[in-house]
Amino acid sequence: ASNLQEWQDAMNMRSIISFNGIYADKEGNIFFIHNSSSPKRLEGLDWKEVVDGSRSKYIWNDYVALNEIPQILNPSSGWLASTNQDPFKVSAPSDNLKKENYSATLGLQTRMTNRAYRIKELFMENNKISEIDFDNFKFDNSYSKSSRSYKYVSTIFDKEFEEDKLIEGQKILKDWNLKTDLSNKSAALGVCVLSPEWLAEQEGIAPPDTEEVFRDCVYDLSLIHI
């Protein structure tokens, strides 16, 4: 494809059945599509549950048209960011699509990743972005205070501990600037505590008890540094 129309025509072939796409060209166009080859399903059913496959009206035979799946062209904010997140939170709030305008049968994800929160924060905090800024955004290694990870870690902040090591570990977490660069001495404990939550989310199970994870991390890291 050499222009936006050709790119959209290529996407309309539906050869790529998944994977979000963001397009940009020398003309200044930017375009987001929450790409999918989604079945055209009967409305009014919870398709996450078991559906009676013996009834013909529940059997789908076609795909939802490309223009019926979430997409944004040239938002006024001037930016788009897609990092495996809610397709209704890929630009500034004034430019985002409205969930109620799309069929619930699409089964669109609503999760937000830490990367999604961070890139949104970085774009929203900066009205003008240089090429250097853009590179820094790309390689940002911070956790967002809006992320599940931070909310999980922060449950440790108000707990009362008696052991000196746990009190010290709690202070390290409270003082952590949420960055994970090589020289960040707090990152080891922070990432150790939040990692089980991330793994649990990936597996679709409840996260483990934060205090137990914190205790294990503090003592495991203490042994490493003896």
What residues fall within each predicted segment?
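N-terminal cationic-hydrophobic initiation segments that often serve targeting/anchoring roles
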Residues: 12-15, 158
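Alpha/propeptide regions of enzymes that mature by internal proteolysis
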Residues: 2-13, 119
